[in-house]
Amino acid sequence: MEIRFTRAARSQFQKALRFIASDKPSDAKNFRLTAERSLGRLSDFPESGRVLPEFPDLPYREVIVSPYRFFYRVENDVVMVVGVWHSAQLLGEPE
């Protein structure tokens, strides 16, 4: 299964990496690698992320790479990452 990011999710991920790198560049690199590895598992196990506790009736799941939450949905043979939020942010309903 292919993994893709929406334009907004890609922007949020890059913003998170820049924020982490502003304090400690090596942490940003490690975070990126950990996120890529965690999201990569979704290729084989797309339902392995947890259902969003805030919106259990919506078709979205999440993978947590602390302190960020990667929100996704499965569309046919694609895992579509739709958002990347810091865990301290308030979550609005996904679009």
Q: Where is each model-derived feature located?
A:
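Basic, Lys/Arg-enriched alpha-helical interface segments
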Residues: 2-60, 78, 94
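Enriched for short, Lys/Arg-rich terminal
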Residues: 65-95
